A protein has these predicted regions:
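Acidic, PIN/NYN-like endoribonuclease modules and their adjacent C-terminal/linker elements
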Residues: 1, 32, 105-138
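Short, well-structured N-terminal submotif of metal-dependent ribonuclease cores
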Residues: 1-37, 46-59
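Alpha-helical elements of the RecA-like P-loop NTPase motor core of helicases
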Residues: 11, 82, 125-129
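Alpha-helical scaffold domains
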Residues: 25, 67, 73, 79-81, ...
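Helix-adjacent hinge/juxtasegments
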Residues: 50-76
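Active-site neighborhoods of divalent-metal-dependent phosphate/nucleic-acid chemistry enzymes
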Residues: 70-123
Length: 138
C-alpha cells in the first residue's frame, strides 16, 4: 500500500524531475480526502500565477481527476482528528498532521499489507518518521 500526499500527486501530475511514486499495476494507492483540496488548489494557483493558460488548466484538471480516481481516499474522521491534534514530538503543520494521522489509521487497517508514506515534503517526511512510518520519495 502506498500512501501519497499532495506533493507526490502533484509531482506525478506535473511530471516534475526528482522522481515520483513508482506506479506498478496492482498497487494499492491511498490518501486522505484532503489531497483533493490541496491538489486542485495547486492547479488553480499555477493558473493564477500565469504558469498555466486556460486550456492547460482544463487539461491538468482532467488529468488530476483521472489521477485521483486511482486513489482510495480516506475520510477525515474522529480518529484522524484526534491523532492529528495530538503531540508529534516534532514541529508539524496542521495539514501534514492530517496526512500522517490518516496514514497511521490506514496502516492499522492494512491487514498485513505494508504501508509506505510517499512525500516530497521534508517536514512532512520528518513528521511521518516521528510516528514510525516508512517514508519514501524525499
Amino acid at each position: 500500500m502506498k500512501y501519497v500526499d499532495a506533493s507526490a500527486v502533484l509531482r506525478l501530475l506535473f511530471s516534475e524531475p526528482g522522481g515520483s511514486v513508482p506506479l506498478v499495476r496492482g498497487d494499492h494507492l491511498v490518501s486522505s480526502e484532503l489531497v483533493e483540496i490541496e491538489t486542485f488548489r495547486a492547479v488553480d494557483r499555477e493558473r493564477l500565477q500565469g504558469r498555466l493558460d486556460d486550456a492547460q488548466t482544463a487539461r491538468k484538471r482532467k488529468e488530476l481527476i483521472d489521477l485521483l480516481a486511482m486513489l482510495d481516499l480516506a475520510a477525515i474522521d474522529r480518529f484522524v482528528i484526534d491523532r492529528a491534534k495530538g503531540s508529534f514530538g516534532v514541529n508539524v503543520r496542521a495539514l501534514d498532521a492530517i496526512h500522517v494521522a490518516t496514514a497511521e489509521m490506514l496502516a492499522g487497517e492494512a491487514a498485513g499489507e505494508r504501508l509506505e508514506f510517499w512525500t516530497h515534503d521534508d517536514r512532512q517526511a520528518t513528521a511521518a518518521l516521528s510516528r514510525g512510518l516508512t517514508v519514501r520519495g524525499v
